[in-house]
């Protein structure tokens, strides 16, 4: 069945109001898009901000007459008579199939592949992690995840104990186990992340070697040979003493979730406890590594 799509250029202050009005007008779906490719890298705790320039996209049944809706929108003082909008017909598709077609196996380093479950594994002899996009982020496509996966692939993790701080989907924890780690402890503040990590570990037959905790439940004496933390600069700085305490003397550290301009400050801060290496960059993001003093 075809649909009618209405796109309205607005701003973050008015997007929610427009969304509510369009739902009252019979829209079956509302989404928000970035109007000017402006990333939001580190929102304040508890906030889910919109982009300053926001596009409200509404879907209506193909038989809907949008003339009254457009007329109503023109009366809104924050839009006005000549507000920027576009109406177009959208042909129905197998959207699930279209979404699935966008995900392909990705190689990281020399040994490691991340493969969606519906794709054929390119190299059965490689280290293959089966992972589908889901509620908890982290499928290898983001530069910070890729940087961490490449680092893990470069290590000899045989019989090493690993901590994944901010485990999200569990992609780094599962990858470490598939690469030979003795065991991994995953820590995250989100129950959904804990559940997703457990499910992905079970899918990859490594759940028996993965322990998962909320921060308040982690063992007080927890230590590891390798710690990877793919979170944001603020939490990395705040948690630095705890992260340092969790790494054994001579152990390895990787930090990501950092913008290029944040890397030097975080590296300098962690140098209290670690001999830090030069930052590695991918697009706008950075990875820091170091060895525990």
Swiss-Prot record:
EC number of this enzyme: 2.1.1.-
Biological processes annotated in GO: methylation
Source organism, top-level taxon: Bacteria
Keywords, sorted A to Z: Cytoplasm, Methyltransferase, S-adenosyl-L-methionine, Transferase
Catalyzed reactions: L-lysyl-[protein] + 3 S-adenosyl-L-methionine = N(6),N(6),N(6)-trimethyl-L-lysyl-[protein] + 3 S-adenosyl-L-homocysteine + 3 H(+)
Residues that hold S-adenosyl-L-methionine according to the record: 145, 166, 188, 230
Keyword Flavoprotein applies: no
Keyword S-adenosyl-L-methionine: yes
Gene Ontology MF term list: protein-lysine N-methyltransferase activity
A Pfam cross-reference name: PrmA
GO CC term (a single one): cytosol
Subcellular location, record wording: Cytoplasm
Function statement: Methylates ribosomal protein L11.
HAMAP family membership: Methyltr_PrmA
NCBIfam families (alphabetical): prmA (TIGR00406)
Family of this protein: Belongs to the methyltransferase superfamily. PrmA family.
Protein name: Ribosomal protein L11 methyltransferase
Organism encoding this protein: Shewanella baltica (strain OS155 / ATCC BAA-1091)
Protein's gene: prmA
């Amino acid at each position: 069945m075809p649909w009618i799509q209405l796109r309205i250029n607005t701003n973050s202050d008015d997007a929610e109001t427009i969304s509510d009005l369009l739902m009252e007008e019979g829209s079956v779906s509302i989404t928000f898009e970035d109007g000017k490719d402006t990333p939001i890298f580190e929102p304040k705790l508890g906030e889910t901000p919109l982009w300053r320039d926001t596009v409200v996209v509404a879907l209506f049944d193909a038989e809907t007459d949008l003339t009254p809706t457009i007329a109503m929108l023109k009366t809104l003082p924050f839009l006005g008579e000549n507000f920027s909008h576009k109406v177009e017909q959208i042909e129905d598709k197998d959207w699930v199939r279209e979404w699935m077609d966008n995900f392909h196996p990705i190689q990281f380093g020399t040994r490691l592949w991340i493969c969606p479950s519906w794709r054929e594994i390119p190299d059965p002899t490689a280290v293959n992690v089966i992972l589908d996009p889901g509620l908890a982020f982290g499928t290898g496509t983001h530069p910070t995840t890729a940087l961490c996966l490449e680092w893990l692939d470069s290590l000899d993790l045989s019989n090493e104990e690993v901590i994944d701080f901010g485990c999200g989907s569990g992609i780094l924890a599962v990858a470490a186990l598939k690469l030979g780690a003795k065991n991994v402890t995953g820590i995250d503040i989100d129950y959904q992340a804990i559940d997703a990590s457990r499910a992905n570990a079970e899918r990859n037959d490594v759940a028996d070697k993965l322990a998962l905790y909320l921060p308040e439940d982690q063992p007080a004496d927890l230590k590891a040979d390798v710690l990877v933390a793919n979170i944001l600069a603020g939490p990395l700085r705040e948690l630095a003493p705890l992260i340092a305490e969790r790494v054994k003397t001579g152990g390895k550290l990787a930090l990501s979730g950092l913008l290029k301009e944040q890397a030097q400050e975080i590296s300098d801060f962690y140098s209290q406890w670690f001999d830090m290496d030069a930052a590695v960059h991918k697009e706008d993001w950075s990875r820091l590594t170091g060895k525990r003093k």
